[in-house]
């Protein structure tokens, strides 16, 4: 798959998440809002995988779509990939949008009640009942990271 079509797939995932969150704010019933937010989380996680696929292809990394494996592959090639380094820092910060995405996605996947899915010591921006505010924050943060990565990649 070419770089432009990889970018297109990532863009489609992020746009789908944005549209699902918009629909969620227009809903009157809680179950539908929760369903749309869960669907948006899936699209966001898929968008993150899309970004990882773009990086993997751009840097010719042989690893699977796993942040740690991609970092190891980059280190083995003797290269530093700024977007992977940034994601690693975010992953290690329990308060980051990336950690929130992983927690919320896993909770949705496991059909857990949102408020019970978060770790007791983790303070999140929002928890499921915030009308998608935290999910919108994740969307804007991921979108910003994708755009910065592409801008940096275009300079080289």
Predicted regions and their residues:
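Charged alpha-helical initiation segments
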Residues: 1-35
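Short acidic alpha-helical/loop segments enriched in Asp/Glu that coordinate divalent cations
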Residues: 27-30, 53-71
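A structural signal for long alpha-helical coiled-coils and helix-turn connectors
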Residues: 21-25, 55, 150
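Alpha-helical rod/repeat scaffolding segments in eukaryotic adaptors/tethers
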Residues: 30-37, 80, 128
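Amphipathic, well-ordered alpha-helical segments in soluble domains
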Residues: 13-23, 43, 50, 138-141, ...
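Short, hydrophobic, well-ordered secondary-structure elements
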Residues: 36-57
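Acidic, Ser/Thr/Gly/Pro-rich intrinsically disordered interaction regions
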Residues: 70-156
């Amino acid at each position: 798959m070419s770089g432009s079509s990889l970018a297109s797939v990532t863009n489609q995932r992020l746009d789908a998440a944005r549209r699902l969150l918009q629909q969620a704010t227009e809903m009157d019933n809680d179950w539908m809002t929760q369903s749309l937010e869960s669907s948006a989380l899936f699209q966001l996680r898929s968008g993150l995988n899309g970004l990882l696929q773009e990086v993997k292809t751009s840097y010719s990394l042989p690893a699977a779509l796993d942040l740690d494996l991609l970092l190891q592959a980059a280190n083995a090639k003797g290269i530093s990939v700024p977007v992977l380094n940034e994601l690693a820092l975010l992953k290690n910060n329990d308060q980051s949008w990336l950690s929130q995405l992983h927690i919320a996605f896993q909770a949705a996947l496991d059909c857990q009640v949102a408020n019970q899915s978060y770790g007791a010591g983790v303070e999140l921006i929002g928890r499921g009942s915030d009308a998608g505010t935290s999910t919108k924050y994740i969307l804007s943060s991921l979108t910003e990271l994708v755009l910065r990565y592409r801008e940096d990649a275009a300079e080289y």
